[in-house]
Amino acid sequence: MVAGELAIEVLIAGVAGGMLCAATGGLPALSLAGIVITAGEIANVTGGTTTVGDSTGAEVFDVAAAPLTAFGVSGAVGFGPILGPHVAFAGGVAAAAYLGRRETIDTGFRYHQAKQITKPLGSRPEVLAVGGGFGLFGVLVARVSADVGFPVDPVMLAVVVSGFAHRLAFGYPLVGRVRDLPTSVLDMSPFERDERWGEPDNETSQGTGGRHVVEPWLPAHYDWLQVGVLGVGIGVASGYVALVTGSVFLAFGITAASLLFLVLGLYDVPVTHHMALPASIAALAMVPEFEPTWLILVAAGVFGALGALAGEAAQRTLYAHADTHLDPPAVSIVLTSLLIAVLAALGVLDPGPVPYPEL
């Protein structure tokens, strides 16, 4: 099915989803999607419905609500045109980029205001319109990606494309201020030394005055070793959840739901859904090949670490020097999904559990 054949109901729902989550904020929207995905996967695992209406899987209005092979509520809502990250989260992030260029969203926020994605943005028509427009854009990008057969996660690819698109649309640098850096783009030590642009008394300015030279995505979690070890732990745990439930998406849903703690101000809680998803897929895709089972968990830990390190590399190159939120976990999932698709094509992984187009 090509993008031009998308049911009008799905397109309208995409606009509504983007508007809704521009009002609530991008990160609250993603945590809500995680809650819905978790509930949907539990229903699937325990024998709940795996159909929506008269359609099989996630097909609604003659179109797959989720390009991923998710079922029931997970696919139709959690990955669909209302709460799917490519719609809701991306719409909320774009709305923050729009509003953050014009005014202060949060006087206590240390970075550029356009990176403030945890706060509700209200109900002003222009803000909702931006969210709705990028929600629609996310539906179209994900659908085109799935139809063309790109061997990556179409939902997260749409999140990444949307992030670059809102930077272009609202006049932000595409990758940030990387030419004037005294050190490598990967170097976060200027943050540790509290180095700033301009005068130090304008931390919430929409310009550069007073801002950190580099702005780590998660100030409590950017050390390579710490991030990698965390990825191993999350990967093993997610692999175990996948093995005992048979669900590719349950661990992803749980870890995405945990973003609610960040929304509530517990900023030391790590972001881990980009570690959980590749680990879960790898665990299920290795089942026919690996014995004993503990080796599967080891492999899941490796994929969790890869997801973690890819996310850290993404934040250092595409977030820390920029003015808006371009989601490091989404970039990570795009990269790890491509790796998984390649390994499936080479016969290293069983392509059956892999929820992406085959190479």
Feature locations, PLM:
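Alpha-helical multipass membrane-protein architecture
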Residues: 2-359
